From Swiss-Prot:
Family: Belongs to the class I-like SAM-binding methyltransferase superfamily. RNA M5U methyltransferase family. TrmA subfamily.
Record's protein name: tRNA/tmRNA (uracil-C(5))-methyltransferase
Binding site for S-adenosyl-L-methionine: 186, 214, 219, 235, 295
Record carries keyword Repressor: no
Molecular function terms from GO: rRNA binding; tRNA (uracil(54)-C5)-methyltransferase activity, S-adenosyl methionine-dependent; tRNA binding
SUPFAM superfamilies: S-adenosyl-L-methionine-dependent methyltransferases
Cellular component aspect of the GO annotation: cytosol
Top EC class, one word: transferase
Known role: Dual-specificity methyltransferase that catalyzes the formation of 5-methyluridine at position 54 (m5U54) in all tRNAs, and that of position 341 (m5U341) in tmRNA (transfer-mRNA).
This protein's UniProt keywords: Methyltransferase, S-adenosyl-L-methionine, Transferase, tRNA processing
Amino acid sequence: MSLPRFDPAEYETQLAAKIARFKSDFAPLDLPEPEVFRSEPLHYRLRAEFRIWHSEGRLDYAMFDPADPKRPVLIDGFPAAAAPIAAAMPVLRERVMASEPLRRKLFQVEFLATLSGELMISLVYHRPLEADWEAAARELAAAMGVQLIGRSRKQKIVLERDWVLESFELDGRTLHYQQIEGSFSQPNGGVNRQMLVWARRQAEGSGADLLELYCGNGNFTVALAPLFGKVLATEMSKSSVRAAHYNLAANAVDNVTMVRMASEEISDALAGGRAYRRMQGIDLAGYRFGTLFVDPPRSGLDEATVALARRFDRILYISCNPQTLHDNIAALRDTHGIAAAAAFDQFPYTHHLECGVLLQKTAA
């Protein structure tokens, strides 16, 4: 696969091809007509990273084409990048080129932006960072008005903070999310907001309680929690759990219990398996679970989690891999059918498609 071309004139054509493939692949599973949620055709990506190419005193941003991975493709800009990233790229390059402490052995640059306009830049080096780097970096951060981090092997220098704060309006609420450097956050902010709206619409009227697996930094948790009595949310990443606690407090969400456990562990606990230390103080018998929400990694749900899912009347499933979503739905066909479906174009001009389904229990 080659590097994507970012041509707005081709946007609808490339999206139509992905939707057609989704509908064809899922037709044997009785897929209803999916809602389609489009991305902005340009400046949609809130995360980006680039290698830095040094040549005769000049620095350039570089990407690598999977079709020719050893040859760098030098770029002046990145049309997919969100506006704060696109505006910062040329300024950063010129300022770093003019500063020997910032330029020397700079290997990679990583950007993390928000819909609300914040920007964090991580500069990654192949050398230890010393006092001269920090002094130059503080000048750069102040001049550009960004959060700046320096990293090298076994070293990380955070000038102010290693996170940005996302804020946006959703169904009459202003939501706030801490997004930590190096932790997962949704790359396409506009499409993410559409996913939250769709998920809330499917969850309305569910009542009872919610079990959420793979909750990350609480992206969906914060949006969905007001629609349920109580929520039990699980996540394995320590940094994501910290961010989730921050985000729940920042949004005044007080009906969520977070536990750092893998999906197979919570499946075992709910099935009456062994006692887990991290579940101490949590009264599982006090929950009336009616809905399961999952947003798993590309590998999808394991067998234990599929077995757990069978016990729920409603399963809300967001997937970044249609193939494993297909396999999981096929495994649940004896108990659940697809009541609603959606396609989210998180990654325009690529073959990737984010999908959402609501599965409703059809048999005891």
